[in-house]
């Protein structure tokens, strides 16, 4: 009896062992499936895949993009719409390699437009190098002779244009261009403006980019004259304002900002720059119209995505 009892107990232990092993295996398989998101209803509870999908969706769902590239105390803005790309200003001459690398990283190997607001080095510094390195379909720039702007940087740009036999337009206010899903209109300076070698800033070409739903305004180093002309003669309401003259107090007048009413105001400037940009008065005026101020010296490169309805960044 004792022997049978022991044998019977041994069989019972073996059966429980088998059951435990089977149950453990099932639990392990279910755990793996749950963690990898293969059990229906579980995948959306995993933080990492969900966050990754959201980021990708924002980028792949965008119809066009605006990249306010951090070029220190200078300016460079890249606009991408599918296979179309425009670069507005090109930073200083020492920024060429960085800008070319950035273009490559975001998949831009040619430009439909190279838009140059005015011939100061912090806006056209890398233009010659860019023209020599990648295909540029058309250059848009103010019609300023070398006699008015006698700088090595400007002479180098004109030489590169001649070497590459670039197509150059000298647009005036009111001219409109198409690019992908959007168009852009020249909004300053006045067609009657006569370039003054003492103040090339007021010769800055300004553009208003629009997809019909959202608008961006950019006008180089334009100051009071440019702003007054735009207020009087142009439609300038914009969701995003690339702030004039790096946030100088001589730009971004109250009357001008009241017309633009930007949701976002981007200031391209260098950290601890010698000019003290952005100036306190300009910041106060921007704040007074409810603009969210964004600065490249604090945030680095700033990218906006447009999906036809919304703006994300």
Role assignments for model-derived ranges:
Residues 2-313:
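Non-globular, low-confidence helical/coil segments that flank catalytic cores
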